[in-house]
Each structure stands twice: as structure tokens, then as C-alpha cells.
Amino acid sequence: MVGFVPLLIEDVRTQGSREAIRRFAHVVYVLVPGLVFGYLIMGLVWPWSIMEPGHPFQALTYFSHFFEKPWKEMFDGALVSVPDMPWSYLPTLFALQLPEILLALLFAGVVGTFMSLSRVDVTARRKTIFLMLTLAASLPLVIAMVKRPALYNGIRHFVFVIPPMAVLAGASFAWGMNWLKNNHRRWQPAALAVFTFGLLLPLSEMIRLHPYEYTHFNHIAGTVRGADKMFMLDYWGLALKQASDGLREELVERQEFPPLGRKWKVAVCGPQRPAQVALGPDFTIGWDSQSADFAMTLGEFYCKGLTAPVMVEIKRDDVVFARVYDIRGRAISTLLAIPAP
């Protein structure tokens, strides 16, 4: 609603208070169908929420407090308990994970938005549009920085602010190209070349990381190579699927079979479900490394590097995402590098 303020002020100045309030009420009225539609969609994807009228408010109260047993994650090279993440968690990760060209254009868009608020040559409608985009992109982050809830798994809980960021950045680029057209037309090709290079930079990183694009860190962070020891990368353990496929292929190639009367035992350090699904019913998955045949470890801070033969190694951009070790005949007490929470 804050985004409507410039338009409301302009209406009061030109139409009078009564007409301005009437027009504002009409805007709220035409938004009601959208709220109803949103409520129905919420019911489809979250049936519990509409079983009783008070359920959404009950959920709001429940989830406003961290209800899990706290654990630690890597942030800026230090292990930090997730309820105690510093206010800088989100701005740091957004600055290090978003493409450089998006950050530059977004900064220009935010500055331009606030500068336009005091300009009389910019229409109230335009001010409202850009202020709403700016608030949609920044207000949730500011609230999180002030309230400091439990934060973990990077920026995934705040990806909803990226679309308005992208729209604001795109509008900033369009305004810049239009300004060059009217003032320095010969610079337009150079600006377009810089923009194209800015798009190709993250694209090349995504190609190198595929299918683990969600672990992307930009060149400000030094890509995933620079971020590897400072932040968590594959927190969902997606690389365990490829590691599992590699283990199966390796065993087939070696023509090895499990001991008579039992399945292969694999101790997994990381989310076990990806490995369990990928390996299938011929393998037993667990944490116990002492009785396991193989150890599958995620390339994160909480998993040990073992002194055992490496059967499979998943790497991207010289960073190890996962490994499978042959630990038959070895006494491996634990796969964890730190105590379990």
C-alpha cells in the first residue's frame, strides 16, 4: 500500500481529498478478486489452510518462531547457529549470488526510483510503479534484517523478491539506453556490448555448474571456487544423485556383487533421500559407517574427507560436490566432521 502514496498525493492535489479517497477505494475494490483467487490457490496447494478460517493466522503465529532443534551452517567462513545468523546474511548472499549485471542495474534502478520521487517532471503513475517494484524487491529483506529470524539454506526462502528485482533492473537498462539514444547515441553499441557480456558471464558459470546451477556464486565471491570454504553450496545434496549413479556404474563395470545374503551397505553423509532414490532397492542406506561397504559424502563442511580409495568424485569448477569411498575392511567411526546437532 505504501507504493500507492505518490499516486494518492497526486490525486489529492489535482482531484481533491474526497475524489482521491474514492479512487483509492476503487483500486482496493478491483484487487479483491485477486485476493479471492489467491485464497483458492492457497487451498489447492495447502488444504489445511482453508479447513478452518483461523488456520492461516494460526500458521502465521506458529511459524513466526523457530521450532526445530538449532543447527549450524557455514556463513562467511564461520559456523553460525541458524537462529543467530547476523543481519548481514541476506544482503551478503544476494550480493554474492546474483549476477553482476543484475546487481548493477538493480542499484541504478533503486537510486533512480528514490530520486524520481522529488521530480515534478515524472508522473505520479510512474513514481508509484517504480516505488512498488522497489518495495517488493527490498522490503522483505529489510524486515528480515531488522527482525533477524532463523536463516539458513542461502537465499532460497527469499527468491520471491528476485522477479521484481529483475523487472526493476530491466527498466533501469531501458531507461539508460533511451537516455543514450537522446544524448550520446554513439555510446549505445558499447552499452549493449557491456550488457551482453554481463548476461554471458553468469550463463557461462551456469553451464559449468549444470545441473547444480542453484549453487552459483558470482565473480565478486570468486565463483564457487572462492565460496566453497566460506559458504554452503549444495545444501540439498543434489550431487548425491549423480554420485549414486556413478557408484552403480562402477560396480557394474567391476562386476562386483554384494556379499551373499545381504545388500550393499552405503553410509551417507548428507541428505539421504537423493541417494536412497537413486540407488534403489539393491542398497541399504544409513549413517553407520562401521558396517558399511561404501561411504558417500557431500562436499560440505560437516562431512569428513576420508583416507580411503575414491570410487566416484563429482566436481564442478574444481570444487568437489560429492565423493564415494570404498571403505570395505576399514574402521571408519563416523562420517561427520563436527558433532551432530
Regions found by a protein language model. Give the residues of each.
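Transmembrane-lumen/periplasm boundary regions of multi-pass, lipid-linked membrane glycan transferases
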Residues: 3-151, 197-245, 323, 340
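Cytosolic-side transmembrane helix boundary signature
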Residues: 8-19, 168-193
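Conserved, well-structured beta-alpha core segment at the onset of a catalytic domain
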Residues: 20-21, 144-147, 155-159, 167, ...
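Catalytic lumenal/periplasmic loop and adjoining terminal transmembrane helix
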Residues: 46-51, 56-66, 149-151, 186-332
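Hydrophobic/aromatic-rich transmembrane helices and adjacent perimembrane loops
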Residues: 92, 96-107, 152-177
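Hydrophobic alpha-helix feature that most strongly marks membrane-spanning transmembrane helices
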Residues: 96, 115, 147, 165, ...
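Short, low-complexity, Pro/Ser/Thr/Gly-rich segments in the mature regions of secreted, periplasmic
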Residues: 334-340
